[in-house]
């Protein structure tokens, strides 16, 4: 992509937004003279206009004038031109890059109102519950003024509270709670228990953090533990016996593998002749995780060990881009257990994944998606290619006065820390507030100890002390304040400077290490110089920093003659730093792109499964689905009853025996009626007998109860087979790169295997459902456990490969409108139940 193609769309979008914003500003005086009721009436008129399928574009200026005036009347804040421009860009579904302190909270209320006019629900997504609370508290009085409702979602809410809040015109929520609620909604066994009403429009605050930094970490809901823990300890003990020559470690990809000598040791340790034999797949899996846990994951960097509420040591994951603890999250596929074994703390059994989704897949489900952040332009290509959003940099309301000093580069960390402390002492004596950014919890603790030695009072904000995040950052601009923060740097919380701090030079941001992304560094710099304030930034870097040790080892030799114990700042190192960061950014983008290529396969299957569940839960008569499943089962029974596979000659006795064993059980099926029939007549006759048999079951009860039992059986079978599918496909994906002998691209292998497994899933659901219906004898009981083991050759089923359309399932899948109408009906029922109670 050349420079012109990158810039032109941004300029075009920005110019369009600027023209609209200027029209809004021209009408300021006109709207000042409207009464409160007149503004409300105008807003209601637009809602009615849109309800008649008219576009908002024709009323966009009027809508912006209304909400701008209401914000002023409620909060005494008048939206600046740049805030209006940002709102317009987000309204059209693009990514607005707005610098820190430019008023994103107000901008988001503008655009939330614009989309709420459609009355379809707007999700305002941010990274933590503090920002949810701040955003909702600012928006609520404004939108209530216009008779719109605002909700907020927190993790401790019950189902009823969440449903009411999601049913508001605008709902503030965290990205994690949004994702988990989506997964939980697609695990319900009663449609009325869903809490979300659909995914129409999402605005993602801190969009780069959610859509880029967290893209590789899937949301996972786990089921019951599936295996013993002893093998994790054994694998960890083995790895701790290895010498450097027994394994290889690639610093760039952080991949680690056994060498030939390591494999020989593994064979002796685990008493096996061939380490790579298929029967050793579990050993290989656990040893691989133990290698990663011991050599690429470190306490204080990727995770910390902390106490839980019961005083037990636990592993808490650290978000690499923010430094925050990722509450409630754990590594999957056994890596969490490997780290627990390494740290010699209680090992939790590995749980089976019952539902999972990545943020990439989640947000691509929305009909309309937009985002806002202070830093995004360096990832513009990725946002366009993956999310179809153009990143547009919004001009600041006031010129930026921050001075970004050249980097200081040192040979080693010891010298770097010496100069950092010297700089802090000098600035602190002058009263200048200082924010020091570190790349890890470990570095923040080192700096804390060094500052204590020189008696400089300071605050520390890292994953061990994140509870006071907003409070610590809010005070970071006070006179003589010194604040140490990991990469989180209090995103979403303004650092306001006192008059004394401004006189002392404004906030100085000191970076103690370059991250692997220019965007993360820009986030740290951007804490200073907000809204035209003065400020400074400088990075102190050593050749021992992670960025160099992992990604620039080939270039370090060239730097030897340019370094000494003294500070160095040269064009050579600036170029080396920038090139290294670009290299890492490219690697990370390729990783995320690869992730979405793989995830696209599972995403399509997930969507089909979830829509089929909705169809079953909504429908009052699921026999049409049962009969399509029956068609597939009958085809398989007939296929196995052929005397010769390539001929239409059927062994009637074998067919009747199989049908009796799997469907009719002790009920009599007259095989004499089948003799003399042609191939297609046999199929028709068997289906008719099965349907008659099922109808006899239905006559033992009401149609409603029969459908309820049928639904329970179908949902239970779908969920059970989907869980197995997730487990198997995840293991295939983990090992697909080792299958080079097939001479196919790993992705192609994964697609082929996953498609075959999904066909098997559909066959298993069909067989289990049809066989279970045959077992029904009506009593009041839970039929979800009524799963039958079918007595057929599973390999023959797969060879026959008669695809169940969850095929024509496409014909029966409900539309979004149908789902919404059902949601509304169930919502009314829930309200009635609540009122009656």
From Swiss-Prot:
Q: How does it sit in the membrane?
A: Peripheral membrane protein
What are the record's GO terms for cellular component? cell envelope Sec protein transport complex; cytosol; plasma membrane
**A molecular function GO annotation:** ATP binding
| Catalytic reactions of this protein | ATP + H2O + cellular proteinSide 1 = ADP + phosphate + cellular proteinSide 2
Q: Which domain of life is it from?
A: Bacteria
Q: Which InterPro entries match?
A: Helicase_ATP-bd, Helicase_C-like, P-loop_NTPase, SecA, SecA_CS, SecA_DEAD, SecA_motor_DEAD, SecA_preprotein_X-link_dom
Function description: Part of the Sec protein translocase complex. Interacts with the SecYEG preprotein conducting channel. Has a central role in coupling the hydrolysis of ATP to the transfer of proteins into and across the cell membrane, serving as an ATP-driven molecular motor driving the stepwise translocation of polypeptide chains across the membrane.
Name this protein carries in UniProt: Protein translocase subunit SecA
Organism in which the protein naturally occurs: Ureaplasma parvum serovar 3 (strain ATCC 700970)
Gene name in the database record? secA
